[in-house]
Design a protein with these regions (language model features):
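Conserved alpha/beta-hydrolase
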Residues: 44-63
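A short loop-to-beta-strand scaffold at the N-terminal edge of the catalytic core in hydrolase folds
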Residues: 7-17
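Short beta-strand element of the alpha/beta-hydrolase
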Residues: 21-29
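Gly/Ala-rich beta-loop-alpha elbow adjacent to hydrolase catalytic centers
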Residues: 94-103
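Short beta-strand immediately N-terminal to the catalytic nucleophile in serine-hydrolase-like folds
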Residues: 90-95, 116
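Alpha/beta-hydrolase active-site loop
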Residues: 36, 67-86
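The alpha/beta-hydrolase serine catalytic core
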Residues: 110-171
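The serine-hydrolase catalytic nucleophile loop
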Residues: 30-42
């Protein structure tokens, strides 16, 4: 499989397969990395190329002072999709979990989209996690941050951002 490492602005990326007019942008989920796209590239090649990036604080970008949050990931994906649309005739998306959510924030629906375990309603997910933590939104608002059962933190600012920036409806 032909593999090319590149940067789109400052974003590390990998491009799989021989040149084609068709591209699949592969967006990994939490704890993922750009190299996860290889098995998918093996399936869609030679009819399409696959472009994958490391989202903030993932893959080759781990341990940097970057936040894995929608306000950092979505603008980056907007830039990557603009690059893709400038270089390929057809651009599609294959995204996993929170990667699907970030993609829906970042750009309008592509011709084709394949989602694996997508987060389709981030606000609902956060509210369910608030309930599971045994607190109310008021408590989260007052404290700002609260430990979630899963080991990460619930954030009032994150919830407010999600409410102020609804994801685009692709379906």
């Amino acid at each position: 499989m032909k593999t090319e490492q590149l940067f789109i602005e400052n974003t590390p990326a990998v491009l799989y397969s021989e040149p084609s007019d068709t591209l699949w942008l592969f967006v990994h989920g939490q704890f993922g990395c750009k190299e996860e796209a290889l098995p998918f590239a093996e399936i869609v090649s030679p009819d399409a190329q696959v472009l994958s990036i490391d989202l903030p604080n993932h893959g080759t970008r781990q341990n940097r002072d970057e936040e894995f949050a929608p306000w950092t990931a979505a603008p980056e994906l907007t830039r990557v999709m603009a690059y893709a649309r400038a270089h390929w005739r057809a651009t599609n998306v294959r995204a996993t979990s929170i990667g699907a959510y970030f993609a829906r924030l970042a750009f309008a629906a592509p011709e084709k989209a394949l989602f694996v375990s997508p987060i389709v309603d981030m606000e609902r997910l956060i509210c369910d996690r608030i309930c599971a933590a045994g607190i109310t939104e008021q408590i989260l608002r007052e404290r700002g941050m609260y430990p979630a059962r899963e080991g990460d933190m619930l954030s009032w600012d994150y919830l407010c951002w999600v409410r102020a920036h609804p994801a685009k409806d692709w379906y």
